[in-house]
């Protein structure tokens, strides 16, 4: 994940004390991250809210299937989509069928002894004028510069599971301060992020703490996503398995906020394995 990559890069660039400072900021809610979300041209997209339609209007089958398949909603079409859940219907404006292409590439594993073994690597290439963005919340001066520095290094080294093969490189196209909105789209996002009125659209895959769970799920519409995986470590030769958790997916709609946590999901005593699970909410009308 992005947070795991930021932790690793912080450790490489600044050492253990800086890493613990970053984790402390997260625990205290002073550094928050959304999931990554797509953009196309000048348009930012939000996860389609997990909310049932109450509209009784008859909709053409082709259009109904097209809307059902949508995963992302343009920011400036969000309110129109929300209204269509109660009356009328939603016709998506022109947007890409997808933001890129999944494909496979054959690579070769060359052992010290024995035959070369081919294997497949799954890849994703973004379409022209498409990419990913995320929202980050800060409370202290200088945090944005620290993040930008880490992202510049990460862009050069890569992010993801195939960095050693040269994949996962990126560059930061722009940095926008949403508390200084400059057009209708950023104005909408700023007000939604500042809103303290339910319902709330969840932008971060995250898990309430045990004592928050019941209250957080009251009246909520949500999906669960399985979070598991392995932890790479310089202290052991093979990756270590991490605890499996089931978290609320981005796009879940909640009536009550929660704090979430930075969970230690390590299954060994080698060192902690942190999983980011703090939410960012948008107050929306649904």
Locations of the language-model features?
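Conserved active-site/ligand-binding neighborhood in enzyme cores
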Residues: 1-286
């Amino acid at each position: 994940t992005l947070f795991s990559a930021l932790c690793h890069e912080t450790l490489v660039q600044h050492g253990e004390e800086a890493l613990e400072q970053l984790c402390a900021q997260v625990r205290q809610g002073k550094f928050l991250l959304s999931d990554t979300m797509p953009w196309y041209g000048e348009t930012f997209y939000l996860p389609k809210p997990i909310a049932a339609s109450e509209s009784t209007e008859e909709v053409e089958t082709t259009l109904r299937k097209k809307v059902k398949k949508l995963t992302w909603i343009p920011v400036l079409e969000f309110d129109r989509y929300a209204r269509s859940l109660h009356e009328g219907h939603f016709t998506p404006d022109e947007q890409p069928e997808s933001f890129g292409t999944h494909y496979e590439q054959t690579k070769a594993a060359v052992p010290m002894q024995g035959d070369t073994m081919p294997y497949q690597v799954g890849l994703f290439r973004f379409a022209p004028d498409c990419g990913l963005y995320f929202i980050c919340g800060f409370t202290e001066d200088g945090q944005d510069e620290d993040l930008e520095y880490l992202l510049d290094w990460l862009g050069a080294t890569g992010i993801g599971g195939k960095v050693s093969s040269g994949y996962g490189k990126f560059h930061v196209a722009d940095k926008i301060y949403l508390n200084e909105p400059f057009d209708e789209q950023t104005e909408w996002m700023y007000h939604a992020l500042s809103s303290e009125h339910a319902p709330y659209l969840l932008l971060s895959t995250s898990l309430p703490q045990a004592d928050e769970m019941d209250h957080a799920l009251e009246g909520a519409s949500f999906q669960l996503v399985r979070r598991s995986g392995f932890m790479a470590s310089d202290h052991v030769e093979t990756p270590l398995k991490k605890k499996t958790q089931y978290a609320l997916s981005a796009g879940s709609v909640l009536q009550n906020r929660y704090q979430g946590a930075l969970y230690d999901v390590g299954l060994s005593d080698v060192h902690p394995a942190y999983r980011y699970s703090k939410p960012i909410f948008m107050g929306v009308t649904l």
